[in-house]
A protein has these predicted regions:
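N-terminal signal peptide c-region/cleavage motif recognized by signal peptidases
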Residues: 15-20
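N-terminal, active-site-proximal structural segment of metallo-dependent hydrolase catalytic domains
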Residues: 21, 236-349, 405-428, 439-440, ...
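Extended non-catalytic accessory segments flanking core domains
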Residues: 21-277, 283-297, 327-329, 359, ...
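Structural recognition of the beta-strand scaffold that forms the well-ordered cores
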Residues: 64-67, 96, 146-148, 193-194, ...
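Solvent-exposed loop/turn segments at secondary-structure junctions
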Residues: 71-73, 84-85, 101-104, 199-201, ...
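Metal-dependent phosphoester-hydrolase catalytic domains
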Residues: 216-224, 228-249, 314, 356-383, ...
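Structured beta-strand-rich core segments of catalytic domains in phosphoester-bond hydrolases
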Residues: 317-398
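Active-site His/acidic residue clusters
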Residues: 386-388, 394-417
């Protein structure tokens, strides 16, 4: 009989032997000593304890956790990948002989020689953990069964489809405003990762989904119980009880219909490229899904003017996008595009869509200042029935990625902050130079800066106000989520005279809260507008006559 077959047979055999006959021998190493480094690595050890979590079977962790009955308790992982999942259960006391090692810094017993069943001792009571108060205890509780009695909020789902994990936070969602002290380090003590008892990539089925096949940010879970560990740079919990989620942030309805006012909206199309395999779709099937999603968003927004960002910088891409959007719309609701020959040298461009049945396009212009890698586009509009002029400028400032080693580095507001601030300054000067009869201009698009950062400070100092800010609670002022932190990068900004004409406004949270695997290039692409982009659209209704 081979080694692992002998182990399984031995385990099944000793279940029937009285505990005292097998487990009364001395010489066991305290789990606390193994964790503390008192026992030398790569040596043979005997440990005993109560089984607290069993993660055996296909695509699982390949082992189980033991915990002693001291206070405070210590826990340890036993790596036994060939052991059948039916051989152990929580509450069972066992004695394990094997080799003590550290795997990626985590202590564990592996290369098992013997496992003895010492009888049923009763399930270990979990240690209560509250965040952020107990954040300093998490290292000491690695390998221990814990319970989070307070409600935890889903604040990150980026890894859900990739590795089956969710980022959770105490005290509600993690919000990023750009103000000093609002960064990732400020939130570190509030976070824990809910894992799935496995480190396998692309789990199937994807765990923790609701009946709609999603798990939105803002949903909550209470009484989370499992084994605490630290892996891949984060404290993680492998649940021993199925988590029960509350859909605290259900999918929102489209903005309410408002036929009389003028509606202006932002729309990030997340790299709409006809050139396959570049930034956008990798195949014709993905492109078709992207088209369908974007058409659903446009129908839901029902805007008169749309400021687009992330369209491939070639004329055919914008033409195709407009054609695809118009296919499902009645004649009076179809769009025309406003672009400009001077669209910049970047791979992507901005553009404006508007409804000719409702608006007359009076003039267009582009800001060709070389400070802009994506030239802003301005359109002047007047209602078809007559009325005052309104300008809408589509913008997309430099992103916080591709950081340089020197110069405009990250000094607390992301790299390229100086460039974004200069772009804001140039934009204001350009708009002033084109102002027609004192008509106001709505700045619409992706500023790539949070509300309290320098570019927004400069725009506010020039009299620009966040048109959607009045109708939104602070917790709803976000359009993008990065590393579990929600913040606003996309804006509709204008002078107070325009703000006085706002009848309704909001952010349609259809994208940032949804897991990426629902996107057009994801593993499980969803139908409809959900995860049509990684940015949420902002909309505003104006009484403009």
């Amino acid at each position: 009989m081979h080694g692992w077959n002998r182990l399984t047979a031995f385990l099944l055999f000793v279940v029937a032997i009285p505990a005292a006959a097998d487990c009364s021998r001395g010489g066991t190493a305290p789990i606390a000593d193994l964790r503390a480094g008192v026992v030398a690595e790569n040596g043979s050890v005997t440990v005993d304890g109560i089984v607290t979590g069993v993660f055996l079977g296909r695509n699982r962790l390949g082992g189980f956790y033991l915990q002693d009955d001291r206070q405070p308790p210590s826990g340890l992982f036993v790596y036994a990948p060939r052991l059948g999942p039916g051989n152990l259960r929580p509450g069972q006391r066992v004695q394990v002989e094997g080799r003590f090692v550290r795997f990626h810094g985590r202590p564990q017993v592996s290369r098992i020689d013997t496992i003895r069943d010492c009888g049923y001792a009763g399930r270990a009571e979990p240690v209560a953990v509250r965040l952020p108060e107990d954040a300093g205890r998490l290292d000491a509780l690695q390998g221990v069964k814990v319970r989070f009695p307070d409600a935890l909020t889903v604040t990150g789902n980026y890894e859900l489809g990739r590795y089956g994990s969710l980022r959770l936070s105490s005290g509600g969602r993690l919000l990023r405003t750009g103000a000093p002290g609002s960064g990732a380090n400020a939130h570190a003590d509030r976070q824990i990762v809910l894992d799935d008892g496995s480190y396998r990539a692309e789990p199937d089925p994807i765990p923790y989904l609701d009946a709609q096949g999603t798990r939105r940010l803002g949903d909550t879970v209470q009484g989370l119980t499992g084994i605490l560990t630290h892996a891949f740079g984060a404290h993680r919990l492998h649940p021993t009880r199925e988590p029960s989620f509350i859909a605290a942030n259900p999918r929102p309805e489209p903005p309410p219909a408002a036929p009389a006012p003028l509606r202006v909206s932002t729309l990030n199309v997340e790299n709409y490229f006809l050139t396959l395999g570049q930034r956008g779709a990798r195949s014709q099937a993905e492109l078709q899904r992207q088209r369908g999603k974007l058409a659903a968003v446009v129908r839901g927004l029902d805007a008169d003017v749309l400021a687009l960002t992330e369209v491939e910088n070639r004329r055919e891409a914008l033409t195709d996008l407009v054609r695809q959007i118009n296919r499902g719309l009645p004649q009076g609701q179809r769009y025309a595009a406003v672009a400009h020959p001077d669209s910049g040298t970047d791979a992507i461009q901005v553009a404006l869509l508007y409804r000719p049945e409702r608006l007359d396009l009076v003039m267009t212009a582009a800001d060709v200042d070389p400070v802009h890698n994506r030239a802003p586009v301005l359109g002047w509009f007047r209602a078809s029935a007559g009325g005052p002029l309104l300008g809408v400028a589509a913008v997309h400032f430099k992103a916080k990625v591709g950081c340089p080693d020197t110069g405009d580095i990250d000094r607390g507001q992301g790299c390229w902050n100086r460039l974004r601030t200069n772009q804001a300054r140039s934009l204001l000067e350009w708009i002033d130079s084109l102002r027609r009869d004192g008509a106001p201009v709505v700045i619409a698009g992706d500023i790539n800066a949070y509300a309290a950062e320098d570019p927004l400070d400069l725009l506010r100092a020039a009299g620009k106000t966040n048109l959607a800010g009045r109708d939104l609670r602070p917790s709803g002022r976000y359009t993008y989520v990065f590393h579990g932190e929600a913040g606003q990068l996309d804006y509709l900004l204008a002078a107070p005279a325009v703000a006085k004409r706002v009848t309704a406004a909001g952010v349609w949270h259809i994208n940032a809260d949804e897991p990426p695997f629902l996107g057009y290039s994801g593993r499980r692409p969803a139908s409809g507008p959900w995860r049509s982009s990684d940015h949420d659209p902002v909309w505003v209704d104006l009484h403009w006559r």
